[in-house]
Amino acid sequence: MIQPKEYFERFIAWKRHPDPKSPKVTYESYSAMDLNMLTHEMDFGIPGALEELGERYLFGLGLSTDVDKALELFQQAADAGHPDAYHMLADVYRTDQHGRQDLDRYFKLLPSAAERGSWKSMFNLACAYYRGKLGYDGHGYNLDHAAALEWSLKSAEMSRALLEIFFARPCTQDLRDYFGDVYDTFVRAVYSAAKQYMDGDGTEKNPDKARELLTSAQEFHKTHLHSECPQFAALLKKLAENG
């Protein structure tokens, strides 16, 4: 699986030099590139540019909506190893938003996106295993709460590692918007995994593991966001009350 540092530096962000006379850089999102710059980077096969241009075609952001073109660009970015492109190749088929809903195809592609390192696909896969086929009108996977726990933990690990890199680098607002989604998934993944440990759901009941997971995540939250996460605090309080 991809390492978080490569994920961040090769696929999520690019380096902007605000001052040509200074070696200092700011990390920027590909979404900040104008169309000319994005097309130029795409011509050189830059995965982040390919993925971003795919999203612009998919959602009609400054371009005419073209789902086929979007899929072509996502595939090129995925071939270069971009985890988010793998996620998009699956997610296009999750709903009818783009006129391509095909849940069987979505669930066929989702594990590959998760295995390639997509933090979002990892958690979506956890949810799919937790809900089972009944949660998706007969589509998807057999109920498997143990697998759900495994993928929630992997999503929490990847999203936390990416957040650590983000907090350590000078980043622009556009990149902060992306990492807002990473943060939300981190909280949901930690909460879900801790709850399963607390309830013995898909695993042996293990309040110590739940407490360890939540305490570590809460300390991370305090260090970087200077506040407690209310979701983590609620579960830690429940653990304390139950002894």
Give a label for each model feature.
Residues 144-161, 208-223:
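TPR/TPR-like (Sel1-like) alpha-helical repeat modules
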Residues 18, 43-46, 59-61, 80-83, ...:
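Short helix-capping/linker turns of helical repeat alpha-solenoids
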